[in-house]
Amino acid sequence: MFEPSELSNNAIIKVIGVGGGGSNAVEHMVRERIEGVEFFAINTDAQALRKIEVGQTIQIGNNITKGLGAGANPEIGRTSAEEDKELLKSALDGSDMVFIAAGMGGGTGTGAAPVVAEIAKELGILTVAVVTKPFNFEGKKRMIVAEQGIIELSKYVDSLIIIPNDKLLKVLSRGISLLDAFSAANNVLKGAVQGIAELITRPGLMNVDFADVRTVMLEMGYAMMGTGISSGENRAEEASEIAISSPLLEDIDLSGARGVLVNITAGFDLKLDEFETVGNTIRSFSSDHATVVIGTSLDPDMNDTLRVTVVATGIGMEKNLDVNQIKNKSSREVLMDYRYQYLNISPKKTDKKIIKKEIKNTKEKINKEPEYLDIPSFLRKRAD
């Protein structure tokens, strides 16, 4: 049997939460004890920063906002970040990879996140952003602001994963509590960071180093991520199929992905044929021209359970679209013109249905209760 190899690289990975929603997500990751990464929370709201349990916090734009927040104005968020650009640069400096978590449509997240990403790009840091989009019922203005913020952010990040809050209405049960929804929301961003970071930071039977991750994610544009968890005899097949099929994904051809990153997380009982099963399932939907990187992370606490995380990069719309293209459009027109890629969800083991045939072509609708989704920042504030 293979022996786990020691960590052969010491890549510095930082997770930056920008604004209220991003900071809350980072706080959740700290509590969940994701290993091998440094956490930062950035906000214009001094009171919000004092409340969260994140070791390193950065207040921006104090001369502009006086510590009172950006007031849902992205321009204030942007100028606040630019005011403290040197402070942000010091926080990012020395990183090999940076994750940026933010909610789009408000002030600080929408305005400051692109500035953080621009600084990271100037420093030559591999940068991945995971952001949320508002509900449609929040209004056209907020949606268009979010779309503009996403396009601005896309100019500077290497890969961008977008989580649509509006999908909550379709997949969450009406009886779910706010606390459960908040917990589910935070798990979305945690899953994105954990699935990628652990490939680098955790030893495994087949290690993936930072250079492999960089190859798959560098300058790839829009991305999609999925996670599947299963146990039992067919856990490898089931987990990988769940990871690449989601009721949140609409009309997305994953065969167009230019890069695919796969993390298999299991205990010491992981078998060679299970590794092969996951690999064959992933290759069944990916293009022959795609760069596919598959690695393992060993977690002694996962006795009979196996988790597969798939990140497909270089799919969907082109990078660096012009913001002026959408300024005069309604939110409906914007959504029709730009097809964004959505973060996958992991269904509960008791509710999962397995797709058996031609995964890349199937369009089956699966009724599953998700383990996690995102909640917008304005709902978080109401719950406080």
Swiss-Prot record:
Keyword set, alphabetical order: Cell cycle, Cell division, Cytoplasm, GTP-binding, Nucleotide-binding, Septation
Cited SMART domains: Tubulin, Tubulin_C
Keyword Cell cycle: yes
Molecular functions (GO terms): GTP binding; GTPase activity
Record's GO cellular component terms: cell division site; cytoplasm
Gene Ontology BP, a term: division septum assembly
UniProt xrefs under Pfam families: FtsZ_C, Tubulin
Superkingdom in the source lineage: Bacteria
Keyword Phosphoprotein recorded: no
Residues at which GTP binds: G20, G21, G22, S23, N24, G107, T108, G109, E138, R142, N186
Subcellular location per the Swiss-Prot or TrEMBL entry: Cytoplasm
Main localisation: cytoplasm
Gene3D superfamilies from the UniProt entry: Tubulin/FtsZ, C-terminal domain (3.30.1330.20), Tubulin/FtsZ, GTPase domain (3.40.50.1440)
HAMAP family cross-referenced by the UniProt entry: FtsZ
Summary of subunit composition and partner proteins: Homodimer. Polymerizes to form a dynamic ring structure in a strictly GTP-dependent manner. Interacts directly with several other division proteins.
UniProt cross-references to PANTHER family, sorted A to Z: CELL DIVISION PROTEIN FTSZ-RELATED, MITOCHONDRIAL DIVISION PROTEIN FSZA
Family assignment from sequence similarity: Belongs to the FtsZ family.
Function text: Essential cell division protein that forms a contractile ring structure (Z ring) at the future cell division site. The regulation of the ring assembly controls the timing and the location of cell division. One of the functions of the FtsZ ring is to recruit other cell division proteins to the septum to produce a new cell wall between the dividing cells. Binds GTP and shows GTPase activity.
UniProt name for this protein: Cell division protein FtsZ
